[in-house]
Amino acid sequence: PVYVNETTKIWCGKISDGEFKGAFVKILNYGELDDKAAKNELKNVLREEVNTLKQVSKCSKRVPSVKDYWDDTRESRYVVIMDTMPGVSLRAWLDKHQRDELQAKDIFIRKCLVIQICEIMRDISNKYPVLVHRDLKPENIFVNFNKETKKWDIYIIDFGCANLNYIRNIGTTNYQAPEQLGIRNTRVSITNKTDIFAIGQIMYEMLLGR
């Protein structure tokens, strides 16, 4: 697996769809939870992610599309197969390209990457105005060097928090907007400004290294 926590594993493998290509296999083991409400909530979150990806993949080629998904009731797990994104996470990219002092070229590349993040979210917002990612962070952004264009390309993954109509302190510390932290289990209006805040935090980290 390329990612593991208490309930979720994400595998990177290959599937055959006329040809071999990379795929992410996301497995949510809801059977490990004793609380029925928590179990149903996790399943609903993953279903929301599948539904969201179906819509978002029509808006941009820079997000993964869902190939297949099912509820494996025998093993008490929910499985989603989606296209893998090329490259490495922005977190891994930043670790590899860490500099004590950024040069003009480093700043230019980072600026271009941030612009691409904004453009992807803009394209999604134009076609799907109600969607807010809610968990933009370096781990959910992939960077790949395109050998044909000689440029770095950006991809965005993990829309599992999008389309949730309530705030449950979702998101990741250091990238959450104030409105994500202030109210818990209360219906509120979240806009794309929440994602803009996260992008600002990401840009700050890319330029200052913290």
Language-model features, listed with the residues they occupy:
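Conserved end of the kinase activation segment
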Residues: 180-192
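Conserved short submotifs of the Hanks-type protein kinase catalytic core
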Residues: 75-89
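ATP-binding glycine-rich loop module of kinase domains
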Residues: 8-47
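Activation segment/activation loop of eukaryotic-type protein kinase catalytic domains
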Residues: 139-175
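Short beta-strand micro-motifs within the conserved protein kinase catalytic domain, predominantly
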Residues: 65-78
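Catalytic-loop of the protein kinase fold
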Residues: 125-144
